[in-house]
Regions:
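Structural motif
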Residues: 7, 112-113, 190
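A short, glycine/small-residue-rich beta-strand->loop->alpha-helix junction that serves as a flexible
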Residues: 12-25
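Conserved nucleotide-sugar phosphate-binding/catalytic loop shared by glycosyltransferases and other
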Residues: 33-93
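Short, polar loop motifs at secondary-structure junctions
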Residues: 42-48, 117-121, 194-200
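Short, acidic/turn-prone active-site loops that include or flank metal/cofactor-
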Residues: 62-68, 138-143, 215-216
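Conserved nucleotide-sugar donor-binding subdomain of glycosyltransferases
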Residues: 75-115, 119-121, 158-182
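Active-site-proximal region of nucleotide-activated glycan assembly enzymes
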Residues: 132-208
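Acidic anion/phosphate-binding donor-loop and adjacent secondary structure
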Residues: 201-222
Length: 222
């Protein structure tokens, strides 16, 4: 066995179900093969550990924000900005706390690379930290950064985001420059939308086409 190359943090922040860990595990397997040490930080450890391959890895509780008030019930977002508002991005103090938690986790793990599935706060927290951030996920979970703001993808959804207030809160909480756009702030260093290009809601505005599924979601164990 060759020398270990360092740790890689594989994170799942938002959403439910096995799909998030299912996308991360093929990457974890390849990283192990290449000499890295994968560490999982997941929204729901019990759910993650239903995936057999995850049981051999260190599993940590990921920081995440619980949707608040009426917004948490029966809510359908019009754009990704509305998702961020539901979890508190317009509340600068709350966002600062979320960023602090992710940064503290990264300091403990000391990863050479972070990979996030539906993990915008991870990307925002590690921006400019020297730790590269690679993002994977469904098409909706990875809005393209080149548009500046988040395109609307659900005309029937409820728009709750105040664009200027959201942008200002994200910049102040993260220490980003005044010209940084919300989409760029959560874009990470590389994105791979794990859906077929035809099914990608951002296909008209995405510079790099969706890459397709990474691999089959591993079956849940007993």
């Amino acid at each position: 066995m060759g020398a270990r190359k360092g740790r890689v943090l594989l994170a799942w922040e938002l959403g439910d179900g096995l799909g998030h860990v299912g996308r991360l595990m093929p990457l974890a397997t390849r990283l192990e093969r290449d000499g890295y040490v994968p560490v999982l930080a997941v929204r729901d450890p019990a759910q993650a550990l239903r995936v057999p391959a995850a049981r051999r890895l260190p599993v940590l509780q990921a920081p995440y924000a619980t949707p608040r008030g009426a917004r948490a019930s029966g809510f359908h977002a019009r754009s990704f900005a509305d998702i961020l508002c539901v979890i508190g991005y317009e509340d600068e103090e709350r966002l600062r706390a979320m960023l602090r938690a992710w940064r503290d986790l990264a300091r403990l793990v000391r990863p050479a690379l972070a990979i996030g599935d539906f993990s915008p706060t991870l990307a925002l927290a590690l921006r400019g930290s020297g730790v590269p951030v690679m993002l994977v996920g469904s098409g909706f979970a990875l809005p393209p950064a080149q548009d500046g703001f988040f395109p609307e993808v659900n005309a029937e959804g409820r728009a709750i985001a105040d664009r200027e207030h959201l942008a200002a809160s994200m910049r102040r909480a993260s220490g980003a420059p005044r010209d940084a756009t919300p989409a760029a702030l959560v874009a990470g260093d590389w994105q791979g939308a794990c859906t077929w290009p035809l099914l990608d809601p951002y296909r008209a505005s995405r510079a790099r086409p969706a890459i397709g599924p990474l691999g089959p979601t591993q079956a849940a164990g007993p």
